């Protein structure tokens, strides 16, 4: 085997942890909107609001998580601490079936754990490569695709356990998965000795009467309580506004920190990619909310007398990501010629185009439901699979570019900002979009027809919105291609 072409051994432990984190996070996510509407009897508006608030805040905390990793914890310790908190949160969520007051607290604990984990797992992977290592893109595609093994199995396993036993057991299974991933990761600890560890000097330094480790403990207790209040009072939108304002200030600081035109150009590319990623995910995140309730209410899920649990459909998207991601990871080493910026915009155009095609298929499904009362399952599966394939041309490309930037000490923060816009703001926008399909009652036939037509309208609008984004990205791609060819001709002459 060519050792230069093979991936670092440490990547397999990172991938294993990612698999189980996906299992934990997406197993719970597949159940959450259904739990709120079917078990806790929230109306659609309330369920969408809480679901989008949760999905938004899990992407706000990576900014703080990235900062703590860069300055104090290091990526490895931040990832381990985040995994532990997420497992605790899922266990508490299971108890909310008995005591609903635990609902907000459990979601808050998961949000804090996710903040420490999500941005720093990618940065930890980035530490395994040199900046221009040709294996880097393949490693990120492998991480993204292999992680989806967990998100394929999770909706099936958690959905089945919930259906056969209870909601609490479904959430507990998600917690067990996260703990299993943490144990596996700890077994490979010796392969990460060259990565950044805990900054003991900063951790032990005193600030305002207490050492920093004391302030860190206070933060770990206070943050979940504060986020619980945000859920309870429905103040999450204000948190997003504050986080966005802080991020703009941080971006301006990083821009001033850039010392060369090349660094400023790289930062500008990352910001532009982030904005298009935000729009992409505002569309894609319908999968856990409006699409999930659409499947639950208007898709014929019967196979030979067995009704497929709605949560299991979340596996379709993940299966498409994994299958196509493995192929892309193999092909990427054959596609390293030409200008990198041109390739990036070409991939983004393809990803947004596939998202538009996926929602076009869902629009056909919704029209079928409007005509016949229920849509066919194969059409739904096809649409979800196309949307899953689209993901491979967005996040791995953007994350790889962020970890490549040549400005010291900013990758964690930039990753957190990327998560804020493409995750938090995108999920808030996704909630606004999903709310257009809300219906509190489906008893009268008129209400049912109205609900189906609402899904038709929303899915069709997303189709055209994604297509418009493709047009803009293609213009950028053509401009970059022309500029690259002009420079090549100038060099030859």
From Swiss-Prot:
Q: Where in the cell is it found?
A: Cell inner membrane
Q: Which InterPro entries match?
A: AA/pep_transptr_DtpD, Dipep/tripep_permease, MFS_dom, MFS_trans_sf, MFS_Transporters, POT_fam, PTR2_symporter_CS
Q: From what superkingdom does this record's organism come? A: Bacteria
What Gene3D superfamilies does the annotation carry?
MFS general substrate transporter like domains
Q: Which PROSITE patterns match?
A: MFS, PTR2_1, PTR2_2
Its membrane topology: Multi-pass membrane protein
GO terms for biological process, alphabetical: protein transport
- Entry keyword set: Cell inner membrane, Cell membrane, Membrane, Peptide transport, Protein transport, Transmembrane, Transmembrane helix, Transport
GO terms, molecular function? dipeptide transmembrane transporter activity; peptide:proton symporter activity
Residue ranges crossing the lipid bilayer per the database entry: 14-34, 49-69, 91-111, 138-158, 167-187, 212-232, 235-255, 267-287, 312-332, 344-364, 379-399, 413-433, 458-478
> GO CC annotation: what is one?
plasma membrane
Give the record's family classification.
Answer: Belongs to the major facilitator superfamily. Proton-dependent oligopeptide transporter (POT/PTR) (TC 2.A.17) family. DtpD subfamily.
Its function? Probable proton-dependent permease that transports dipeptides.
Task: Please report the name of this protein according to its UniProt entry.
Answer: Dipeptide permease D
Q: Which gene encodes it?
A: dtpD
